[in-house]
Amino acid sequence: LRAERVYIRPLAVALVKKLSFGVIGCGNVANNYYLPYIARNHELVAVADTISERARRSAELWGAVKWYEDPDKLLSDPRVEAVVIVTSHESHAPLAIRAAEEGKHFVVQKPMALSLKAAEEIVRKVEKSGVVAVAEPSDPLLSPLFRALKSELAGLGRHCYSLWHTGHSGPTWSEAFFDDAKGGGVLFDLAVYDVARLVTLFGEPNRVAALGSVLMEERLVLKPEEATTAIRRDTYGRGVYYFHDLKPSVPVKVTAFDDFAGILDYGGGLAVTLANYVTFTQLHMPPIQLYFTEGAVSVHPYAPLIVVRAKSGERSLGREQIGEIKPYYHASIDHLAECVAKGEKPLPSVEWGYKVTKVLLALNEAAKTGKTVSLA
């Protein structure tokens, strides 16, 4: 095994014409990741949020030319070439469809849709309009970490089983994350990351089974005005900010799964995905572990990033071998701009997003009915 191999395929962002962006949804993710990156590396033309004060504050903080309360007005703004959709889950698909109808390139946050019908409509509209559309989370296709992982798995034989875990204590800035009717819960918010990785590495599973539970029946979230007034220079303007200085006080009833376990059957090889909103800390264990007939691989959030144990020996890959790993939000923006400039189809396309959505919905059905759901 050669340790000097390098997997990174740098995106030629410096050579790509900057795009004029509009961002729909001015919440935590937008202000932490998309807005500051676009403002630094592209052109931020406009922002929109149904809470007008959030739009105004975000525009002022990041230098957007215009702000809107109505997303449709942003979508019809001729100065906007591309949009980022980072709203609550139930509005992702309608806004993606509208963006395509308006001829706007777009990045849509996960989940792309909450029904197969909506996902199919997005695919149709994108194909008809010819816009470039990126479905999040893009890291399974854009991150050099997962390109390296895929390369390492190629020589390890048959997939036997794998464990995939994502969890934290839960978001405090919106009640929508806990509302099943709004597409809330850990499946669509957190398990989606590992489902997207599994679909990229192994394709669609033959069948899935799942269990979901509501471990904490009531949660506390911030007052909407608290999340709004937090948009200022001494919070997001200084770096990534997650309301550490604010105490949630508004009780909300939890109707969406906050604890979830899914099993994906790949022709006998089983992948187990675990996601939760209830862990206050994380153990120092690899969140991704894969076991094959000829070896095993673990992926770590700290160095070394990948550890491979095979019959031929053991080796580790760090940042030196793998390359720069951008936050996927940033990689998606640059990839969209590159694809627009070159007239190419993006890797995390809406067709790929459709496959991820199909598996997510099957897992949701399995968890709610207690039955195994076939995808074959």
Regions inferred by a protein language model and the residue ranges of each:
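C-terminal helix-rich "cap/oligomerization" subdomain common to oxidoreductases
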Residues: V6-L15, V23, A82-V84, G267, ...
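N-terminal Rossmann-like dinucleotide-binding module
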Residues: Y7-W62
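A contiguous active-site-proximal alpha/beta segment in oxidoreductase catalytic domains
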Residues: P10-L11, A113-E175, D194
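Beta-loop-alpha module in the N-terminal Rossmann-like domain of NAD(P)-dependent dehydrogenases
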Residues: W62-K125, L142
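Hydrophobic residues in well-ordered beta-strands that form the structural core
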Residues: V108-Q109, A133-A135, L274, V299
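Rossmann-like dinucleotide-binding domain that binds NAD(P)(H)
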Residues: F177-A271, Y277-Q282, E351
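NAD(P)-dinucleotide binding in Rossmann-like oxidoreductases
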Residues: V240, D245-S332
